Amino acid sequence: MSVMVVRKKVTRKWEKLPGRNTFCCDGRVMMARQKGIFYLTLFLILGTCTLFFAFECRYLAVQLSPAIPVFAAMLFLFSMATLLRTSFSDPGVIPRALPDEAAFIEMEIEATNGAVPQGQRPPPRIKNFQINNQIVKLKYCYTCKIFRPPRASHCSICDNCVERFDHHCPWVGNCVGKRNYRYFYLFILSLSLLTIYVFAFNIVYVALKSLKIGFLETLKETPGTVLEVLICFFTLWSVVGLTGFHTFLVALNQTTNEDIKGSWTGKNRVQNPYSHGNIVKNCCEVLCGPLPPSVLDRRGILPLEESGSRPPSTQEASTSLLPQGPAPIDHLSNEMPEDTSTPEEMPPPEPPEPPQEVTEAEK
C-alpha cells in the first residue's frame, strides 16, 4: 500500500510584511529598496583597497615594514564586516497593529476624545509618558496604527516605524535604529581610520618614489595612486566629520532625529531623560548595552488561513503524522446546520412474555 505525501509551500512572515523593504536569503537579509548608493559605497571601498593592496602595499612592505599591509587588511575586513552587519540587519522595525488591535485602539481614542463635530480637526493623538521625572509624548502613527514607543519614528523611505530611530542612511542601504546603530558607528569609525591610513601611506609611497625618479615621473607611472589619493581626499572630510558628529551624539545619548528636531535643547527646562549625565555611562549604554531581539520574526511560518488556506487546529497539529480518516464533525459544521432540537425519548423496551404451560391434552 503506497502513501502519497502532499507537501504544501510554507509561507514565511517576511513574504507578507508591509513596508518598502527587500528580503534575501529566505528573510535573513533585510534592506531598503533603494540600494544604488549602497552599491556605490561597496565599489569605492573595494576599488580603493584593491588598488592599495595591489601596488602600494607590495612596495611599502619591502621598503618600510611588512606590518603595513597587515594593519590595512585588518581595518578593511572590520569595515566591511560592520558595513554588511548594518546593511543586512533589522534596525528595530516595530510590527504594525493587526486589524482587531487597530479597531480597539480607535475605539479607545474615540472614547477618550469624544465625538468630533464634522468639519473640525480632530485633536492630536498623543499619550503622555513619564521617564526619569520627565514627560515624554507618545505619538500615534496613522500608517502603522500604533502609539509609537519613546524615541521611535516612522521612516518615510522604508515606510516602517523604527525603535530608537536615528536616520535613514542611503550609503548603507538601510535605516539606522536601535538594533544596528552600534554597528553603524563602528563602521564609520573604522572607515575613517582606513581612509586616513590609505591616504597617508599613498603620500609616503609617492614621496619614496619621487626621491628616485622625480615627482612628475612618479605621477605618470602610478595613475592608480593618484586616483586613490583623490578618492581618499574628498571622502576623508565627510567620513571623519560624520564620525565626530556621532561621537558627540553617543556621548550625550542622543539620536540624529532628536538633534535635528531639537527635542532636548534645554528650552522650557526640557532635558534629555535618557542621558545618565556621564559620558562613559552613555557610551556604554549605546555601544555595549544588551542588543534586543528582533520582534518581526521574519522567518516565522504564517498560519494557513493567512497564506491562503485554513489553519490547522490543535488536534490536527498533533495528529498530522497519522493516516487521515473521515473529516471530524466540527469540520462539517459549515455545510450541515447544527441540530439544536431535543431528541425524542425512546420508548422503554416491552417485557418478555411469560412462558406458557403445556397441558396434558396438548401433550
UniProtKB/Swiss-Prot annotation:
It catalyses: L-cysteinyl-[protein] + hexadecanoyl-CoA = S-hexadecanoyl-L-cysteinyl-[protein] + CoA. Keywords: Acyltransferase, Endoplasmic reticulum, Golgi apparatus, Lipoprotein, Membrane, Palmitate, Transferase, Transmembrane, Transmembrane helix. The keyword Lipoprotein applies. Residues 345-355 have a biased composition (Pro residues). The keyword Transferase applies. Residues 1-35, 85-183, 250-363 are cytoplasmic. Residues 303-363 are annotated as: Disordered. Residues 139-189 form the DHHC domain. It is a multi-pass membrane protein. Signal peptide: none annotated. GO terms for molecular function: protein-cysteine S-palmitoyltransferase activity; Ras palmitoyltransferase activity. Residues 310-322 have a biased composition (Polar residues). It is found in: Endoplasmic reticulum membrane; Golgi apparatus membrane. One of its GO terms (biological process) is positive regulation of pyroptotic inflammatory response. The DHHC domain is required for palmitoyltransferase activity. Interacts with GOLGA7. Belongs to the DHHC palmitoyltransferase family. ERF2/ZDHHC9 subfamily. Palmitoyltransferase that catalyzes the addition of palmitate onto various protein substrates, such as ADRB2, GSDMD, HRAS, NRAS and CGAS. The ZDHHC9-GOLGA7 complex is a palmitoyltransferase specific for HRAS and NRAS. May have a palmitoyltransferase activity toward the beta-2 adrenergic receptor/ADRB2 and therefore regulate G protein-coupled receptor signaling. Acts as a regulator of innate immunity by catalyzing palmitoylation of CGAS, thereby promoting CGAS homodimerization and cyclic GMP-AMP synthase activity. This is Palmitoyltransferase ZDHHC9. It comes from Bos taurus.
